[in-house]
Swiss-Prot record:
Superkingdom of source: Bacteria
Subcellular location: Cytoplasm
Pathway(s) this gene product operates in, as recorded in its UniProt entry: Protein modification; protein lipoylation via endogenous pathway; protein N(6)-(lipoyl)lysine from octanoyl-[acyl-carrier-protein]: step 2/2
Residue span, Radical SAM core domain: 76-293
Chain sites annotated for binding [4Fe-4S] cluster 2: 90, 94, 97
Reaction catalyzed: [[Fe-S] cluster scaffold protein carrying a second [4Fe-4S](2+) cluster] + N(6)-octanoyl-L-lysyl-[protein] + 2 oxidized [2Fe-2S]-[ferredoxin] + 2 S-adenosyl-L-methionine + 4 H(+) = [[Fe-S] cluster scaffold protein] + N(6)-[(R)-dihydrolipoyl]-L-lysyl-[protein] + 4 Fe(3+) + 2 hydrogen sulfide + 2 5'-deoxyadenosine + 2 L-methionine + 2 reduced [2Fe-2S]-[ferredoxin]
Name the record gives this protein: Lipoyl synthase
Naturally occurring in which organism (per UniProt): Pseudomonas syringae pv. tomato (strain ATCC BAA-871 / DC3000)
Length: 318
């Protein structure tokens, strides 16, 4: 296959997206059949409908909808939502992720105010702000995160804000300096998988770099809980998961999420196993023994799953 030409603003998906990563992705013939314990209820409620209508009104897209999150109904009904800023084109090519790759367009200077107005209109209580990777920006997008936080707090003073940030590769010092000046209520960065699988699952990322990012933020802003998460089912062993959890605690990470990886398409990394709910429960027990303030562990758990409740518990224990 000829390498696709990457033009600004054009998203590469599927086979085109993973064409240049160091590990060849062989398309699966069929997507694996999900076990009985992975069942998603269609979210239906007046509050869910209200939030969806307002999202359309403000021309916003929540990660909850874009990723077809199984917990959308629970979160929307509870006044929680996750928004992606800085566009929908990522500079990385992670083959587990369904976000398009390419050369992003310039940042929208009006986005912080527009997002703040929309969140105030939605009457949300807890908001998670995440983003694509922006390796094209000198600060990795940290200032844009800070601008969004500031504008949202101006219009919604009582709101709780969690940021799920990229790894700020090569830009950690400047990014953390900006973040510490306008810190969120929870600082989240996902390790995603065990170090042995980084080359295949997170090309361009570094396991120790991500751990250091979380630890250094905690050292700079000790009163803000730190959080990270893993997807299970990419080929890791239970022993490797436990080892990563130990390393997280050594780097002062307060909160943990563990969920099942679900293959977005035939051109993404294949699911190697479906982890049983009992195993997820065991991981949670081990996590609390290690000293995590809160552990959300289950097949349908995602990074922002019950994020408001997690944050409340973690802050009470700091």
């Amino acid at each position: 296959m000829a390498r696709p030409k990457v033009e600004a603003g054009v998203k590469l998906r599927g086979a085109e997206k993973v064409a240049r990563i160091p590990v060849k992705i062989i398309p699966t013939v069929d997507l694996p059949k999900k076990p009985d314990w992975i069942r998603v209820r269609i979210p239906v409620s007046p509050e869910v409908d209200r939030i969806k209508q307002l999202l359309r009104k403000h021309k916003l897209h929540s990660v909850c909808e874009e990723a077809s999150c199984p917990n959308l109904g629970e979160c929307f009904s509870g006044g929680t939502a996750t928004f992606m800023i800085m566009g929908d084109i990522c500079t990385r090519r992670c083959p587990f992720c369904d976000v398009g790759h390419g050369r992003p367009k310039a940042l929208d200077a009006d986005e912080p105010k527009s997002l703040a107005i929309a969140i105030a209109d939605l009457r949300l209580k807890y908001v998670v702000i995440t983003s694509v990777d922006r390796d094209d920006l000198r600060d990795g997008g940290a200032q844009h995160f800070a601008d969004c936080i500031r504008e949202i707090r101006l219009l919604s003073p009582g709101i709780q804000l969690e940021t799920l940030v990229p790894d700020y590769r090569g830009r950690m010092d400047v990014a953390l300096e900006i973040t510490a000046a306008e810190p969120p209520d929870v600082f989240n960065h996902n390790l995603e998988t065990v170090p042995r699988l980084y080359k295949a699952a997170r090309p361009g990322s570094d396991y120790q770099w991500s751990l250091t990012l979380l630890q250094r933020f905690k050292q700079m802003v000790p009163h803000v809980p730190t959080k990270s998460g893993l997807m299970l089912g990419l080929g890791e062993t239970d022993e490797e998961v436990i080892e990563v959890m130990k390393r997280m605690r050594e780097h002062d990470i307060d909160m943990l999420t563990l969920g099942q990886y679900l293959q977005p398409s035939r051109n993404h990394l294949a699911v190697q196993r479906f982890v049983h709910p009992d195993t997820f429960a065991w991981f949670a027990e081990e996590g609390y023994k290690m000293g995590f303030k809160n552990v959300a562990s289950g097949p349908l758990v995602r990074s922002s799953y019950h994020a408001d409740e997690q944050a409340k518990i973690a802050k009470a224990m700091l």
